[in-house]
């Protein structure tokens, strides 16, 4: 490593051929691309001795990344997981002006007459080429929200909140209000004191 203050990983460390001894002690993390949750559990519950990180997961192609909530729950319930990096940030396309319907046109995968290309496989980001969010980014943002409601006692009108931030008291930035409606009409509303 050029910088000893940085953690090292090597995704291909998972591939062994059984013909030679591999030396992985210099790696700080065990990393994988696209493992299932059961594969991660097998490593963690087995003899895995390094923190587990997904160097790619939840491919954002098509109508977005899937299983984000399942992965979040797994990361949260296993201390040896470090989370992961969703593939990928931005659709790769070239702006070609406005179409007849006045919508933006983007070229990709053969649109410029090239013979060798990746088709629509370059359109796999969390944002469009102009950086507008896809629905997948909004889902990802929601999954990683800093505070969640984890319970509600209807009898006593008590909400239970879970603060996922390590160093911030939710009272420092969160305000809570409510509205109770009946047939679209507000019956009552108010503010709620935020617990620490």
PLM features per residue range, with description:
Residues 187-196:
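Solvent-exposed serine/threonine-rich low-complexity stretches and specific carbohydrate-binding patches
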Residues 1-160, 164-172, 177-185:
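Extended substrate-binding grooves/exosites of carbohydrate-active enzymes
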């Amino acid at each position: 490593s050029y910088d000893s203050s940085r953690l090292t990983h090597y995704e291909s460390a998972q591939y062994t051929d059984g013909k030679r001894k591999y030396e992985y002690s210099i790696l700080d993390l065990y990393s994988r691309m696209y493992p299932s949750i059961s594969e991660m559990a097998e490593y963690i519950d087995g003899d895995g001795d390094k923190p587990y990180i997904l160097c790619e997961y939840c491919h954002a192609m098509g109508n977005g990344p899937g299983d984000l909530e399942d992965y979040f729950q797994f990361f949260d319930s296993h201390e040896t997981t470090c989370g992961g990096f969703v593939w990928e940030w931005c659709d790769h396309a070239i702006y070609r002006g406005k179409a007849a319907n006045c919508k933006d046109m983007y070229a990709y995968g053969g649109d410029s007459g090239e013979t060798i290309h990746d088709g629509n496989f370059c359109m796999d980001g969390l944002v469009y080429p102009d950086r507008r969010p896809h629905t997948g980014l909004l889902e990802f943002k929601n999954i990683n929200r800093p505070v969640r409601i984890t319970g509600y006692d209807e009898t006593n009108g008590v909400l239970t909140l879970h603060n996922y931030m390590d160093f911030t008291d939710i009272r420092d930035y969160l305000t809570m209000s409510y509205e109770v409606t009946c047939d679209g009409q507000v019956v009552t509303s108010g503010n709620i004191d935020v617990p620490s």
